[in-house]
């Protein structure tokens, strides 16, 4: 979420539903064996989201189709909104590493299977 927040312009917020993808098993093993909360993991590790492409809504289907055709798993991770018109539903991530950019609302629960 922090990386996404840094690339968004100030005044924008992306919503990211944690249930939108299945977290690879290794991250759940780290969480359970290390007794590490999900929020700590999501602040440190990518939890299976290796790259995010921010595209216009009308380009999302083409972008995911092209990625999949190239053998890269792809899905729509979230939607970008004007921050003033949006009510967060979870943990808001912003201002990371000193970047005054946008923000990300991370909500929902992770799927591990």
Question: What are the language-model segments listed below?
Answer:
Residues 1-113:
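Glycine-/charge-enriched secondary-structure boundary and capping motifs
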């Amino acid at each position: 979420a922090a990386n996404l927040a840094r690339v968004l312009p100030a005044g924008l917020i992306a919503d990211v539903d944690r249930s939108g993808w299945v977290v690879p098993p290794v991250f759940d093993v780290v969480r359970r064996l290390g007794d590490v909360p999900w929020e700590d993991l999501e602040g440190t590790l990518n939890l299976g989201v290796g790259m995010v492409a921010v595209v216009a809504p009308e380009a999302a289907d083409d972008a995911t189709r092209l990625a999949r055709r190239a053998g890269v798993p792809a899905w729509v991770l979230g939607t970008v909104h004007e921050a003033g018109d949006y009510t967060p539903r979870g943990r808001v991530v912003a201002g990371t590493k000193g970047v005054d950019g946008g923000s990300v609302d991370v909500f929902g629960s992770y799927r591990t299977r």
